[in-house]
């Protein structure tokens, strides 16, 4: 910083000396030499702008020359645009009082960033996790069943009766072993009937063996109870005896009819 005495020698222009005197009157004694140049440029620009506006107002009022009224009007209009002063303190207090009467919005219970609704955000996941477990494809028409081991076969024969079939219950005990697969096959289980003791009926009962077809899809892990109705041979013989009796009765009726016809 240089003093005003050093910045205002006698060799300075008259406008610069006048600006230095203004600064001295304002109590500014220390300043840079370029301050005077900037103040001169501002004064020249401001004065030319005011004079241009005064000419416009004078021509609009149809005056031959620019008078003091035109300059005052130009200064007033330019002051409203270029130099704005802050509003009075009382005016600011009234505005602040009105503004503070408005209640503040309620504070939400949750904290965090204020985000718009989810449909307007990109925070939702737009992907899916792929499962690592691979499902083995089941072969078509293939059934896995446990292996069966046929144990003892027991039968309890009952006393046969003429004219009615004799039901006989056969139970097959199974043991669950290692699983095996059967592809649409059927197997045959032969269940022989045990020799029955002495039968009270006069017609002896004959033992028979029946074949039972078992579907593999119906086999489970539990014991299987197979029930068969075994009809003894005496049922067929009784049916044949009844048939022969009916034929004999028919023959006797025919003979009686012939005798009656001969007598006539």
From Swiss-Prot:
Subunit structure: Component of the TFIID basal transcription factor complex, composed of TATA-box-binding protein TBP, and a number of TBP-associated factors (TAFs), including TAF1, TAF2, TAF3, TAF4, TAF5, TAF6, TAF7, TAF8, TAF9, TAF10, TAF11, TAF12 and TAF13. Component of the TATA-binding protein-free TAF complex (TFTC), the PCAF histone acetylase complex and the STAGA transcription coactivator-HAT complex. The PCAF complex consists at least of TADA2L/ADA2, SUPT3H/SPT3, TADA3L/ADA3, TAF5L/PAF65-beta, TAF6L/PAF65-alpha, TAF10/TAFII30, TAF12/TAFII20, TAF9/TAFII31 and TRRAP.
UniProt region (Disordered), positions on chain: 150-176, 233-264
Organism this protein belongs to: Mus musculus
UniProt GO MF annotations: DNA binding; protein heterodimerization activity
Family: Belongs to the TAF9 family.
Cellular component annotations (GO), alphabetically ordered: MLL1 complex; nucleus; SAGA complex; transcription factor TFIID complex; transcription factor TFTC complex
Modified residues (Phosphoserine): 149, 152, 155, 158, 181, 196
Principal place of residence: nucleus
Modified residues (N6-acetyllysine): 5
Acidic residues bias spans: 248-264
Signal peptide from the UniProt entry: none
UniProt-recorded name of the protein: Transcription initiation factor TFIID subunit 9
Gene that specifies this protein: Taf9
SUPFAM superfamilies for the chain: Histone-fold
